[in-house]
Regions:
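Predominantly soluble domains enriched in secretory-pathway, periplasmic, or organellar proteins
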Residues: 1-288
Length: 288
């Protein structure tokens, strides 16, 4: 399927009929590419201006949510109206990846060059003391910025929502945040230098970290916070996708043009899929 000249991340709609692709351009492009997965054809692109550099991408609550790295922002696109319907600035450098809770009330982002994680919360603000007598509460968004390591990019929130793990590419450290307390709780010297993506397994018991620099896949036990396995994926491990049924993980090897399949019980590479050049972002498309 034809997309833009610099596709990075991909996501499918909840009904599995439409895919969205961010066309990144190092923060300078302004396009979401759209694909009809049923007819297998490209649909008209979405112009994200004034938001530039769309990268991280999720589909939640009927909308496509994305980071806009070049504009230090996040935004959302509503397929029902065909419009960009919301945006919020982070003020952080290289707002790159994001996670949106199922109710779309909280958004997490990694800000790579700032070395921070943003927690954006949809909040009901109560009237202040100087407000008129008939003033009503109003909705607004608040931001909590948590310092982590420089180069923190890949991250994930545990299935139960109790932990956020992110890995810093520069020093290979893993930072663990309590989302409820909005505080850094722990650091792990994971030695995952070049960390690119991080994903919890569907049961929440392991964390997978890919290294684009070394081609390794680091597997950590969540309870003990210890490395339990390390697999050589190829010359550069990138995107990670978990099978929702908990049986497999798919890991893109960008430098080798294949996607490795890892069995989640044995934690062994069982197969690989030869794909096009420089695979990176991966997504499930599930149709009822």
């Amino acid at each position: 399927m034809p997309v833009g000249v610099d596709p990075h991340e991909v996501i499918a709609s909840a009904d599995g009929k439409t895919a969205y692709v961010t066309n990144y351009g190092g923060g300078s492009y302004h396009e979401l590419n759209v694909i009809d997965l049923v007819a297998q054809k490209a649909l008209p692109d979405i112009d994200t201006r004034p938001l530039f550099g769309p990268h991280g991408l999720v589909f939640v609550n009927g909308k496509a949510w994305f980071t806009a790295e070049g504009s230090k922002s996040v935004g959302s696109y509503d397929p029902a109206s065909g419009k960009l319907d919301w945006s919020l600035g982070t003020g952080q450098d290289r707002t790159h990846m994001l996670f949106v809770t199922a109710d779309a009330k909280k958004i997490y982002t990694t800000n790579v060059s700032s070395g921070t994680v943003s927690i954006l919360t949809d909040t009901l603000i109560q009237p202040g003391r100087m407000a008129p007598p008939n003033a009503k509460p109003r909705k607004d968004w608040t931001q909590t910025v948590i310092p982590v390591g420089k180069g923190s990019e890949g991250f994930d929130v545990s299935p139960d929502g109790s932990q956020l793990w992110t890995a810093a590419s520069e020093d290979g450290m893993v930072y663990i945040i309590d989302p409820a307390a909005k505080m850094l709780k722990a650091k792990i010297d994971a030695k995952a230098v070049g960390a690119n993506r991080l994903k919890f397994t569907p049961n929440g018991k392991q964390v997978f970290i890919s290294s684009l620099r070394t081609g390794d896949l680091f597997i950590f036990d969540v309870a003990s916070r210890k490395e339990i396995r390390r697999l050589k994926i190829g010359r550069g491990a990138a995107g990670i996708l978990m099978d929702p049924d908990g049986s497999r993980a798919f890991v893109a090897s960008s430098a080798d043009n294949f996607v490795a399949i890892v069995d989640l019980k044995s934690l062994e590479i069982t197969n690989r899929l030869d794909v096009g050049p420089v695979p990176d972002g991966l997504a499930w498309a599930i149709r009822p």
